[in-house]
Curated annotation (Swiss-Prot):
Active site: D283 (proton acceptor)
Annotated catalysed reactions: L-seryl-[protein] + ATP = O-phospho-L-seryl-[protein] + ADP + H(+); L-threonyl-[protein] + ATP = O-phospho-L-threonyl-[protein] + ADP + H(+); L-tyrosyl-[protein] + ATP = O-phospho-L-tyrosyl-[protein] + ADP + H(+)
Positions of region (Disordered): 116-144
Biased composition (Polar residues): 126-144
Protein name, UniProt field: Dual specificity mitogen-activated protein kinase kinase 5
Amino acid sequence: MLWLALGPFPAMENQVLVIRIKIPNSGAVDWTVHSGPQLLFRDVLDVIGQVLPEATTTAFEYEDEDGDRITVRSDEEMKAMLSYYYSTVMEQQVNGQLIEPLQIFPRACKPPGERNIHGLKVNTRAGPSQHSSPAVSDSLPSNSLKKSSAELKKILANGQMNEQDIRYRDTLGHGNGGTVYKAYHVPSGKILAVKVILLDITLELQKQIMSELEILYKCDSSYIIGFYGAFFVENRISICTEFMDGGSLDVYRKMPEHVLGRIAVAVVKGLTYLWSLKILHRDVKPSNMLVNTRGQVKLCDFGVSTQLVNSIAKTYVGTNAYMAPERISGEQYGIHSDVWSLGISFMELALGRFPYPQIQKNQGSLMPLQLLQCIVDEDSPVLPVGEFSEPFVHFITQCMRKQPKERPAPEELMGHPFIVQFNDGNAAVVSMWVCRALEERRSQQGPP
């Protein structure tokens, strides 16, 4: 019998939970779960995978009080299901009724012949390696510009990163493009971040995305998040990257300028590096700027794969609030559009709020186009007088010029007095600030 732990609801922390996994046309399997740590969505999928080894399940359903099926695809939806179930259990206990198991229904899976079954990975190269056994390495693939094309083919074809080797732990965040998990890579013993994106695309487009992602192995910058690999399972792409224990900047409060300056230096260096490789980031915003307790700052989620960018845009409808005016208007996009996004991001981090007060970002950065028309029609926002240094005010003002060609070029950004002032390599300033902020957050949350 399989035993796991569960305990997100204090009143039920000693209550044994029985989950009844309904198997189509074959009855059911009962799974006993004891109290303890919070049960994750991935844990349930793992158990369903043991019950239905011939199928790939990406979601499951439960029935509400009206008998309607509710789909669970994330940890948040998992919590909602458990909350609903425990409320019914409490009612059953009060009324002296027999406690019924929590019944879940794995979503109908495609027949094996329609699934991607080659190591749970879409190979971008044909040949014998497609059917070879996955290689097990002592560590995750490192980033190096010296990697040959043959090495890249091997990494993409030998299944070095695949679903079977990953154990999902905590949910780090939900974005408009998918869900990010903290995960454990079994062969290497490394902690990594895995972004899982649901995409309704063909096998050919999956292969194209995997091919386009090859360039990430060439990125060798301390200001760019480390890339370990990617794989498809059904209609989910999982992108495996370096784990940053400080998380993304969007979850932090208003930042002091001496910290903001050193973070800005790292972001500008990261963008300059990408631009030198002819890569536009396309999605510069605080949630794509990551920090760790060592004081490092790194960019993530840049648009190296045009097909992936387009597929996400078709799947997750909306317009990014950090887009430059010309992008919102549907005009040509270039480096200067990244520069606008840089400016509005650091203006938000300095103010502790989004610079356009009429735009509320409570539900993330994607929103209907009409709400963002003010970015196109109105003058650029300005920082309040007297609160910030002249170099910082000038830096933001230049980045947020309405005309793209009036914004600084890459070399002008690096030479700007604000960037020069804080380009001292003092990571300790960022490290102390991140550690203090994380400690304050833990103290506010109280004991686990």
